[in-house]
Amino acid sequence: MKILIINCGSSSLKYKLIDMANEKDIIEGIVERIGLDQSRLVQKNELREKYILEKEIKDHKEAIDIVLNTLVDPKVGVIESIDEITAVGHRVVHGGERYSSSIIINEEVIKYLEECSKLAPLHNPANIIGIRACQSLMPNKEMVAVFDTAFHGTLPEKAYIYAIDYALYKDHKIRKYGFHGTSHKYVSHKVAETMGKDIKDLKIITCHLGNGASISAIKGGECIDTTMGFTPLAGIPMGTRSGNIDPSIIPFLVEECGYTIEEVSESLNKKSGVLGISGVSSDFRDIEDAASKVDKRAQLALDIFHYRIRAEIGSFIVNMGGVDVIVFTAGVGENSPETREECLKDLEFLGLTLDKEKNKVRGKLAEISQADSKIKAYVVPTNEELMIAKETVELIGK
């Protein structure tokens, strides 16, 4: 069984074809600059060999048509017919309050996703365009929506309700939603499997640390809290996002500094985080390199990042009544031994002892705690596309 995964952005489309018989990637690619100059398709096969097609691509429907034709192309394709694709799994950013799990797409689902677009104006409209395009080009294929927010649908009210006028929640659905849910779900299940434990018996903290970053508390297989909120801006500092700040800073910027609301949003989303603090880059590799050369602001950016992660881990341990395993994933979490060491140092009093030799691992599944550590720590490479494929297979029941 082969599942096609589609992830549509406003001017891009990522895709991956997965063979569910062995859960291996067959091929993956991206269509870039849709509707813009210099649009192109870049595809990589399982040997990481590249195929590049440069041509005008005016919209997402044309992009998906090109993807499908490339998949069956005699020279660079990997299947003989589109009939070999069993179903399509779509990454959808926001499922609102209604969808706390993945769902087979129909008109009612699409209508609700359109209503949710006000909650994710940069993402949901593009996701819907991709769904419509696939339905038009593959009318007989079942389509499944897998939501970034869904895994956090188990948050209790005390975790997701903000301490603001309750009418703002009732009338406008302003609450914590959380994001990166597909990643948090995948790595939590993967670490339980690796440990040979039933996830229902575990208390897990998952740290998805990349240019976007979030941390989740997972108890008995259900997410009970997460750091991102109404939007992906909330939580810990990230590459360019501020994370949590005092809300009064916003009117201060408008009234005293002359910012427009658009400029405030631009600053907090694209000019803050470790980029804003360091003045160096939003790439943690560049910041670590600068810090190693005694750049004080770069070191400060890292110190704040690590401090805020530790604060959230501590909070989640208290609210879960303990923790069995802490997981690091995504670009920084998987590839920065320095970040992991700083986040886990001096935790022997809790029963967690890091193995510095094991912690040198990059990008591979590995335990990084000492053998006798009561609390375990792992690096688990995320695989959101495989999680989407698994959810798709589960729903279509084939």
UniProtKB/Swiss-Prot annotation:
The record marks 180, 241 as: Transition state stabilizer. Mg(2+). Can also accept Mn(2+). Pathway: Metabolic intermediate biosynthesis; acetyl-CoA biosynthesis; acetyl-CoA from acetate: step 1/2. GO terms for cellular component: cytoplasm. Substrate binds at residue 91. Belongs to the acetokinase family. Homodimer. This is Acetate kinase 1. The lineage of its organism: Bacteria, Bacillati, Bacillota, Clostridia, Eubacteriales.
